[in-house]
């Protein structure tokens, strides 16, 4: 399998009423190494076929978390949906991160772009 992410599966049978959110256990327990986090994302098939996607769009498992990963799964559809054991409910990826350190300053260096955002680069 050439996919970069690994899938998690729902445990027991769970019913999600229309437009509701439930915390779904993945059955996977984590202890991320120092300097690493685990990010969880929607599975495109589950989102397009059943209207189910993580309520918070991206799940984050910090390096100091210990225990089972849960996905707050939201049913965007107008029909009740069923999650059965073996359904792939999210995909996860290990990512290294840098712990930023911040300085309080009175002003920032000027750039040509400045504070322009949301389409200001012309792309």
Regions found by a protein language model. Name each.
Residues 1-123:
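DUTPase catalytic domain/fold
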């Amino acid at each position: 399998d050439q996919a970069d992410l690994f899938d998690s599966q729902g445990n027991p049978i769970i019913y999600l009423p229309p437009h509701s959110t439930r915390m779904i256990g993945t059955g996977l327990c984590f202890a991320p190494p120092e300097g690493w986090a685990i990010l969880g994302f929607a599975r495109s098939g589950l989102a397009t076929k059943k209207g189910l996607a993580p309520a918070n769009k991206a799940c984050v498992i910090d390096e100091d978390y210990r225990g089972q990963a849960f996905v707050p799964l939201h049913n965007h559809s107008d029909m009740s949906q069923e999650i059965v054991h073996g359904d792939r409910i999210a995909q996860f990826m290990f990512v290294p991160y840098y712990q930023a350190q911040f300085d309080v300053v009175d002003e920032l260096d000027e750039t040509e772009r400045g504070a322009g955002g949301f389409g200001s680069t012309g792309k």
